[in-house]
Amino acid sequence: MKQVTIYTDGACSGNPGPGGWGALLLYKDTVRELSGGEEHTTNNRMELLGAISAISALKEPCEIELYTDSQYIANAINKGWLQGWKAKNWKRKDGELKNIDLWQELDKLLSLHTVTFHWVKGHAENKFNNRCDELAVIQRDKFSGK
């Protein structure tokens, strides 16, 4: 199974507002950059879309180390929240699950790969996370008309 490292980030101006996401896929000596955005979105949707888009770009099952500065995503996976939401028919104990469409899509993708999620501090010394942030901000600014 191929071993791939993924970095993702999201950015939003206002919440909701224009937003963007960026992702890097690292395989051997190759780095592939991906990015996108939406005119009216939230920071959490952009974080999720970054992860979903990066994993979706893989053409075969892989062993993935995914790095995100989103505690929302890292905690949902690493603390078992995602599995709990799924077991409760995609609901939280206090009601509606936000971004259910994206969580369901991510869950399907995770079943195709072996993925380990890592939280990294945003806007720090990690050059890969910082590049994802740059890509996300470029997209956010594009959708905000800057």
Regions found by a protein language model. Give the residues of each.
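RNase H catalytic domain
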Residues: 11-18, 52-131, 135, 140-142
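RNase H-like nuclease fold core
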Residues: 1-45, 49, 53-62, 133-146
